[in-house]
């Protein structure tokens, strides 16, 4: 495996409605079995719902929610001697983005609303206000990092 090259990161195309790369990433994350049309209908439907319920710009709400969910620190396992330590590290910007999108989607799946559009809209509005499942996940990860701050010197 050591002879393989690192996969190059291909730039994402901005979405057609908001001309935003982050929206494209979210749509791609929502997509299952290559059904991008369905994924974009879900996302844009949720944006419409956010617009109706809050009267705010949906892209602004989404970005606010995304920024609130992005983790500042995370823990990574590091084996030293015979024991494994949870070492707090700051994730790269790319990893922060992928974790935030992943956590938002897993929180959406656990919500009680009927349709995917309503669940996504609800999670976006909640996360923008600093509550909801995705924010709870972020807080748990950051709390874990804070608890293991003593092992920060094992950073690599």
Curated annotation (Swiss-Prot):
<comment type="subunit">
    <text>Part of the 30S ribosomal subunit. Contacts proteins S9 and S11.</text>
</comment>
<dbReference type="GO" id="GO:0006412">
    <property type="term" value="P:translation"/>
</dbReference>
<dbReference type="InterPro" id="IPR023798">
    <property type="entry name" value="Ribosomal_uS7_dom"/>
</dbReference>
<dbReference type="GO" id="GO:0003735">
    <property type="term" value="F:structural constituent of ribosome"/>
</dbReference>
<dbReference type="GO" id="GO:0015935">
    <property type="term" value="C:small ribosomal subunit"/>
</dbReference>
<keyword id="KW-0689">Ribosomal protein</keyword>
<keyword id="KW-0694">RNA-binding</keyword>
<dbReference type="InterPro" id="IPR005717">
    <property type="entry name" value="Ribosomal_uS7_bac/org-type"/>
</dbReference>
<keyword id="KW-0687">Ribonucleoprotein</keyword>
<dbReference type="InterPro" id="IPR000235">
    <property type="entry name" value="Ribosomal_uS7"/>
</dbReference>
<dbReference type="GO" id="GO:0019843">
    <property type="term" value="F:rRNA binding"/>
</dbReference>
<dbReference type="Pfam" id="PF00177">
    <property type="entry name" value="Ribosomal_S7"/>
</dbReference>
<comment type="function">
    <text>One of the primary rRNA binding proteins, it binds directly to 16S rRNA where it nucleates assembly of the head domain of the 30S subunit. Is located at the subunit interface close to the decoding center, probably blocks exit of the E-site tRNA.</text>
</comment>
<dbReference type="GO" id="GO:0000049">
    <property type="term" value="F:tRNA binding"/>
</dbReference>
<keyword id="KW-0699">rRNA-binding</keyword>
<dbReference type="InterPro" id="IPR036823">
    <property type="entry name" value="Ribosomal_uS7_dom_sf"/>
</dbReference>
<protein>
    <recommendedName>
        <fullName>Small ribosomal subunit protein uS7</fullName>
    </recommendedName>
</protein>
<dbReference type="InterPro" id="IPR020606">
    <property type="entry name" value="Ribosomal_uS7_CS"/>
</dbReference>
<comment type="similarity">
    <text>Belongs to the universal ribosomal protein uS7 family.</text>
</comment>
<keyword id="KW-0820">tRNA-binding</keyword>
């Amino acid at each position: 495996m050591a002879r393989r090259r690192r996969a190059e990161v291909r730039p994402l195309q901005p979405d057609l409605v908001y001309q935003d790369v982050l929206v494209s990433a979210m749509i791609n994350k929502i997509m299952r079995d290559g059904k991008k049309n369905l994924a974009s209908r879900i996302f844009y439907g949720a944006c419409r719902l956010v617009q109706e319920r809050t009267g705010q710009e949906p892209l602004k709400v989404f970005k606010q929610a995304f920024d609130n969910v992005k983790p500042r620190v995370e823990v990574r396992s590091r084996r030293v001697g015979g024991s494994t330590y949870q070492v707090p590290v700051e994730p790269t910007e790319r990893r922060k983005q992928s974790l935030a999108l992943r956590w938002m989607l897993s929180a959406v799946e656990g919500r009680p609303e009927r349709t995917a559009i309503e669940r996504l809209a609800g999670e976006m509005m909640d996360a923008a206000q600093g509550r909801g499942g995705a924010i709870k996940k972020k807080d748990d990860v950051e709390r874990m990092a804070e608890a293991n701050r003593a092992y920060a010197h094992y950073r690599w």
